[in-house]
Amino acid sequence: AIGSKALTVWLSDGSNFPGQQNFTRAFERYLHSMGEIYKTLPDDWRLFSEHKMYEPAFYSTVVQDWGTNYLIASTLGPKAQCLVDLGHHAPNTNIEMIVARLIQFGKLGGFHFNDSKYGDDDLDAGSIDPYRLFLVFNELVDADYRGVKDFHPEHMIDQSHNVTDPIESLISSANEIRRAYAQALLVDREALETYQQENDALMASDTLKRAYRTDVEPILAEARRRTGGAIEPIAAYRASGYREKVAKERPESKSDGGAFN
């Protein structure tokens, strides 16, 4: 119904104590199960495996990092690729380099966009580290610029909206994702490559920051207008009264919010 031709699998398999799980056998079971799914996948579909460092298990996770994820995708076959959730990494992980590696070897399937401070926080995209989001898109735009073959990563949002209107957060996140993309398009690729070849670290970094500091909001607003959208989408959403309307139509919850009812 929605035209999807990709299946993402994230499993919480892992352990909380040393010795609780045999690492090798656990991974063998994972590969076997994914292999069964892969065999039934239509020829024009892709299978994405997703890594996550920890949680709900805190000692080990079967698919804990991009290296294991790459092994999975390589073992299963050409229809298998890696999905990168920005929040599924340790703080300060160089996610943009992971993206570059997966692009280089044809195994970047797509993204779950969000943001984080400590771990898998599932905060709104661009709310904590918008520069990192820009650097990720810099790698995507660079791949397009270099003409990487069969490069069609999927873009998804995976967030948890606990203190905001979920629709408003999704609108804001979509805007931040588009902003990072627009800024990445402004990078002077020829100049950047020259500085990289000359090992001019300062000017190479400045080339990226110059694009990042550019105010692209007027471009984004005009793009929304040309496609029939609102120039100020959150203001338009609030003025529509949609939230109040659906709140009246929503059935009353019979739960008191406790764990036991």
List the predicted regions and their residue ranges.
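Gly/Pro-rich active-site loop or hairpin
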Residues: Q20-Q21, Y59-G67, H89-E154, D158-N175
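Hydrophobic faces of well-ordered beta-strands that scaffold small-molecule active sites
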Residues: L7-V9, L47-S49, A80-V84, G109-F113, ...
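Conserved, mostly hydrophobic/aromatic
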Residues: A1, D85, F111, I177
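Non-catalytic scaffold segments within catalytic domains of secreted glycoside hydrolases
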Residues: F48, M53, A73, A80, ...
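Extended recognition/assembly regions associated with phosphoester-bond processing machinery
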Residues: R25-E28, H32, E36-R46, S60-T61, ...
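C-terminal extensions of enzymes
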Residues: V163-N261
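Active-site acidic/histidine proton-transfer and metal-coordination neighborhood
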Residues: A1-G77, Q81, D206, R210
